[in-house]
């Protein structure tokens, strides 16, 4: 099905090989997990399999890639795309329409299917994937996880022989990841070949047949799933991989008194009875909580629950319909919130503007000494990339750059929307250390996240949002109940 022989590749403008002498064979019907640190070559390997290398991404290419009987260099990209369907790390980059129905059948429409067949296929796909609630929606109004579901649906509709999934769970909530795992099982039973590049590997332990671990553009380990599951935990950590079982991750115990200002001694950021409306519909209803500098508050919940809307409201980007937000008892207007806060967005590509990592750190920040930038970049393993263009970075590297800028900006209120999306274990821990350092400096720190591993090990408290309301609060060892609580909403 897929045969790679002595493949080496480097992107134009880079000195090192992004892939180095890769040889492997993946038979029909096998489910393969690609794992390894951010920047190890996983995404580049997926681009080789789907034909984007060498047809779209230019660079120095050598070796031979046979995909479903076709030589990838000689075959037309349209022929390859009939055989290989890809869900990209950032689903926004593969959308061509403004509404969900058109997007799901876009590939089939390009193949010339008549309207009645398009409608029939649309209904079957949405029923199979249980996404009827996403029919006839604007792409621009979807949450990150909902966009990921639509991207998957558009690939599923085309029924390719090979599925390539690049970080498919990165923006998904706990329920959606469970649904994704069932869907992967379903297409596996159909005899499809599946290649999944992932950092969150826990949901794939009973699905994958094989694990390929990459390091510095090379295949360092190639093993069957049983061998991988039997590896000692110490070896998994030395490989810088995330947990294989969420139950093995135990919560950090942080005692929070009813008066959080006594516990942490910092400034108090209070949200009272916040309601946000989209047209005549309430997206958030009567949201109230308070946090003190020194605390790290996590806000989690299902895709579309209103988490990103809440983040945008807290930092003044979205207008509340009712309620108030204050800092040390003083009301904060939208303008004041924008001046005093910094938000790391879910799609960090929206807030990267310059032509180098170093310049990005300086943007809009006066009199910032070079040693301060170097210290933060080193702490986030970005110092060697400081001359690179931000848009040439991997998804995880872009995420860390946005976190670096948040540290350097000097704002009082810091809001992170999915800061660990696309991050490996080492990068997640580095981001966690940086966020803890901000909390230690008595900054107000609020993290919007689906990452249960991150919540348990880094955050002081977690608020569960459902249907636009806060339905549960957990802190300390109670965070170990998080998966169980998420199952109930």
UniProtKB/Swiss-Prot annotation:
EC class (word): translocase
Keyword Metal-binding: no
Signal peptide residue numbers: none
UniProt source species: Treponema denticola (strain ATCC 35405 / DSM 14222 / CIP 103919 / JCM 8153 / KCTC 15104)
GO cellular component: ATP-binding cassette (ABC) transporter complex
Function: Probably part of an ABC transporter complex. Responsible for energy coupling to the transport system.
Localization in the cell: Cell inner membrane
InterPro entries: AAA+_ATPase, ABC_transporter-like_ATP-bd, ABC_transporter-like_CS, ABC_transpr_CbiO/EcfA_su, ECF_ABC_transporter_ATP-bd, P-loop_NTPase
Keyword terms, alphabetized: ATP-binding, Cell inner membrane, Cell membrane, Membrane, Nucleotide-binding, Repeat, Translocase, Transport
Keyword Repeat: yes
Primary localization: membrane
Protein residues bound to ATP 2: 301-308
Protein name: Putative ABC transporter ATP-binding protein TDE_0282
Protein's membrane topology: Peripheral membrane protein
Enzyme nomenclature, EC number: 7.-.-.-
Coiled coil: none
Family under the similarity heading: Belongs to the ABC transporter superfamily.
A molecular function GO annotation: ATPase-coupled transmembrane transporter activity
Residues binding ATP 1: 36-43
Domain ABC transporter intervals: 2-241, 269-487
